[in-house]
């Protein structure tokens, strides 16, 4: 959590509240970290942290989007901003797929 907060601070993203969600509660077996937070402007964020050695492809982006839909449905709450932090290479089709769906993608997460 500390590493993520430091990374968010380098991007000038500051949060009042940042809670970790368990992916298994939403039917996912993916090795992904999920956080929900409220920034200083009272915007609700849904943050996915995905780290892998292999390339992040369009199939992965679809799975992440489906997982976010399940979270939104179970929480009964929509998030204004959805973000994805990736440490692996990103496929251009996956990037455009996420941008069309108005996701913020940060590909420089370490």
Name these PLM-found stretches.
Residues 1-34:
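Acidic-basic catalytic patches of nuclease active cores, encompassing PD-(D/E)XK
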Residues 77-110:
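Short, compact, well-ordered microdomains
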Residues 7, 15, 44, 48, ...:
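Phenylalanine-focused residue identity feature
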Residues 23-27, 33-71:
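Conserved catalytic cores of phosphodiester-cleaving nucleases, focusing on short active-site segments
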Residues 9, 19-22, 41-43, 60, ...:
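Detector for Asparagine
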């Amino acid at each position: 959590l500390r590493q993520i907060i430091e990374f968010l601070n380098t991007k000038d993203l500051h949060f009042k509240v940042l809670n970790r969600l368990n992916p298994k509660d939403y039917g996912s077996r993916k090795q992904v970290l999920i956080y929900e937070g409220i920034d200083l402007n009272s915007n609700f964020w849904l943050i996915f942290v995905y780290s892998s050695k292999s390339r992040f492809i369009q199939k992965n982006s679809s799975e992440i989007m489906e997982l976010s839909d399940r979270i939104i449905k179970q929480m009964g709450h929509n998030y204004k901003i959805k973000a994805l932090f990736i440490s692996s290479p990103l496929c251009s089709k996956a990037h455009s797929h996420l941008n069309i769906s108005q996701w913020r993608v940060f590909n420089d997460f370490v």
